[in-house]
Amino acid sequence: SFLQDFVFKNFMYSKQDDYEKQLTQLGIMEKDAYTCTCYMDEVGNTPAMGEVLSWSESSAVVYANSVLGARCNRNSGIIDLMGSVVGYVPRFGLLTDEGRKATWIVKIETTKKPEAQLLGSAIGMKVMADVPYIVGLDKWLGGELDDAAKTYLKDFGAATASNGAVGLYHVENITPEAVKYGKDLIAEDAKVYVVDDAELQRVYESYPVIWKKKDAKPKLCF
């Protein structure tokens, strides 16, 4: 609507044109090159295993660490920016071998393939900022890191990062570090969390329905 466009352009996003101009001057790939999935092949910026990054977007960080085996902390925007400028970031946390050890063993004991975002939410809310080593998920992902598994883990990881604060997870027999090091990635005092059908149902039912009409359908989704 005219009113909606007017409010967005003149109030909510009034500085957007300025930001886009600055990004163009910095060398952005193209005018539509805005994405939270900056690791995708089509972006041309896919990190290699072991490569150190200066990123801050939480779902990108957890994907890079877990699925690609790169190394990156959940940086603030300032650390992200300064790391990109000077070419260095502080060496701690998920940049270190010790910081990448799993302090949780998560056992998947569901009777069917768990919905990625629900499973990610369950694990994220349980382990928060810790590193989980996930056992049994490979049964549902086909045993290899193919495109289907990457898509699943993209959604799964985003949920662990947003409903918790997970920056790295290992999936046994699937993710690169888990394939290379196996259970050597697990810390000696790791805790255990079992995810079965009942646990996923508990997490699902814990989400509040804040609409006046519980069965209503949304007009807009973001």
Predicted regions and their residues:
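Non-transmembrane, aqueous-exposed alpha-helical and coiled segments at domain scale
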Residues: 1-221
